[in-house]
Amino acid sequence: MTNVTGTERVKRGMAEMQKGGVIMDVINAEQAKIAEEAGAVAIMALERVPADIRAAGGVSRMADPTIVEEVMGAVSIPVMAKCRIGHLVEARVLESLGVDYIDESEVLTPADEVYHLNKRDYTVPFVCGCRDIGEAARRIAEGASMLRTKGEPGTGNIVEAVRHMRQVNAEIRQVASLREDELMTYAKNTGAPYEVLLEIKRLGRLPVVNFAAGGVATPADAALMMQLGADGVFVGSGIFKSENPAKFARAIVEATTHYEDYELIASLSKGLGNAMKGIEISTLLPEQRMQERGW
């Protein structure tokens, strides 16, 4: 049987449709409905949010297909699901379920320590994490249709997402300023495919959308990432590990849309209750840092 793949233009266009919005992690139909009612543009179906994955330890895998199908049946907005890095079969299973996007995610335990998926072989568009332009360009070359900062998932700490967004944007500006003869050396030094760097130089930006993810816990966090140039926001544990998930969800959506309206953000932040409990990044051991997964 011949695989039918979606064209790059179509898949990137699907990702562009989520621009300016919030994508929320959910673990059941009830949470999915809360996210949809709050104004999420899409949801990520999981067995456990990143904070619980971090706390549980062990090996984290693709969600039970029953959960994915339950969530898909509960909402009308697009549904994403995560597969392990390099896990060909998990990705094919999710594609067969009819999910709208697959996240080849460092939040799950990698299945392959050498190869990421060839995402061009799939009809469904893929989302991938990145910390710098080298990682971003490699994922794009593999066929990713959407990027997100890795941040440090499940911590409720925005500092790593900020670092990664600033790093990528600074390197985009650097690439745009280079002559084409200088670009080959830059490609060699960063491990970024030359053809992708040429496209970035021509456009003056990444050729796919880049969302913020990994540590967004408050409306102000979401607005901050939008001001730093994010095309939208993923919220993993920040919604359903907060004291009032429905209120936090609505507030984060509003703050993402109106990220320069400080009076509104102040109003949205009043009386929300406690945000999720955060983790100081310096307390994490190297093997606990999910952002280090992927290559």
UniProtKB/Swiss-Prot annotation:
D-glyceraldehyde 3-phosphate binds at residue 166. InterPro entries: Aldolase_TIM, PdxS/SNZ, PdxS/SNZ_N, RibuloseP-bd_barrel. D-ribose 5-phosphate binds at residues 25, 154, 215, 236-237. Coiled coil: none annotated. Keywords: Lyase, Pyridoxal phosphate, Schiff base. GO terms for molecular function: pyridoxal 5'-phosphate synthase (glutamine hydrolysing) activity. Pathway: Cofactor biosynthesis; pyridoxal 5'-phosphate biosynthesis. Catalyzes the formation of pyridoxal 5'-phosphate from ribose 5-phosphate (RBP), glyceraldehyde 3-phosphate (G3P) and ammonia. The ammonia is provided by the PdxT subunit. Can also use ribulose 5-phosphate and dihydroxyacetone phosphate as substrates, resulting from enzyme-catalyzed isomerization of RBP and G3P, respectively. Belongs to the PdxS/SNZ family. NCBIfam families: PRK04180.1, pyridoxal 5'-phosphate synthase lyase subunit PdxS. This is Pyridoxal 5'-phosphate synthase subunit PdxS. It comes from Bacillus anthracis.
